């Protein structure tokens, strides 16, 4: 019996070893390396000099950082609730008896599997001031052509639309799975009691969907805090709107790969990680107050 348990444990550890090694090599070790580098100044040829908290002191008086942090929170505050709301509505509609369910699911999920570079290029064309399809359609209603991505007022919101569009499909599939796990007997009992569809949604569907909503909220929040690729593809770095649309990760990229200030960039990454962890822990703390278990 003891040998059998030992053998089972051996095969268990052996099977999880690839995942563990992947986590160590690509996540855990780089995390501690980044944290160490945030206290150093790294030269062009890789040599590092210990500077202590200088990088962090520089960040807290850097107007660029505060602007990028403000932009990042704007992305989160707008894209997360709006994206989840749209995904929920679509999931509820696709959970009803409608034709071509599979086709609609595929169409809504396509942006998820599309490369960010390709999506960014397509939307950049849609937003183009001179020959973009959006301005072309708006011109029929008497609107003048708008430079969506080069206007400091509109650039951030133009990027938000694309972010929501790219995440809707994934969130919708998760929420749809949550909807299908709700017992139909609850709806049948509610109908017998005379509850309308709206009351069924708010008193049955929404409460029982909260575990899925919580998961989707956490994942969407983290990915939105890390937004970079869409901004990089859509907003020109020489545009007058770049300061109004730059995220913290975009600023990290600029300092790490354009200015070659990798120590400062590592400090930016460490601060963003701390912010994400704190907000995620806060969500887990208040989870019991609204998530159905």
Language-model region placement:
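A structural signal for multi-pass alpha-helical bundles of membrane permease subunits
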Residues: 4-293
């Amino acid at each position: 019996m003891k040998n059998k348990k030992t053998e089972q444990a051996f095969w268990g550890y052996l099977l999880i070893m690839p995942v563990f090694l992947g986590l160590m090599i690509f996540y855990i070790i780089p995390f501690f390396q980044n944290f160490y580098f945030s206290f150093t100044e790294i030269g062009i040829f890789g040599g590092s000099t210990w500077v202590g908290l200088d990088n962090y002191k520089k960040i807290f008086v850097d107007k660029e950082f505060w602007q990028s942090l403000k932009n990042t929170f704007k992305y989160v505050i707008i894209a997360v609730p709006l994206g989840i709301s749209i995904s929920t509505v679509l999931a509820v509609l696709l959970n009803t008896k409608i034709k071509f369910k599979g086709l609609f699911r595929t169409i809504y999920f396509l942006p998820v599997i599309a490369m960010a570079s390709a999506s960014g290029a397509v939307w950049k064309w849609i937003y183009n001031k001179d020959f973009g399809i959006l301005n072309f359609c708006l011109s029929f209603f008497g609107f003048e052509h708008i430079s969506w991505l080069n206007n400091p007022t509109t650039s951030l919101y133009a990027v938000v639309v694309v972010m929501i569009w790219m995440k809707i499909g994934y969130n919708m599939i998760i929420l749809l799975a949550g909807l299908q796990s709700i017992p139909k007997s609850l709806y049948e009992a509610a109908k017998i009691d005379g509850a309308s569809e709206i009351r069924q949604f708010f008193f049955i569907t929404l409460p029982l969907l909260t575990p899925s909503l919580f998961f989707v909220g956490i994942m969407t929040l983290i990915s939105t805090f890390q937004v970079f690729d869409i901004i990089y593809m859509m907003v020109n770095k020489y545009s007058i709107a770049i300061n109004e649309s730059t995220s913290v990760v975009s600023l990290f990229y600029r300092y790490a790969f354009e200015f070659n200030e990798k120590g400062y960039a590592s400090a930016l990454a460490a601060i963003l990680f701390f912010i994400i962890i704190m907000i995620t822990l806060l969500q887990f703390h208040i989870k019991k107050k609204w998530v159905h278990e």
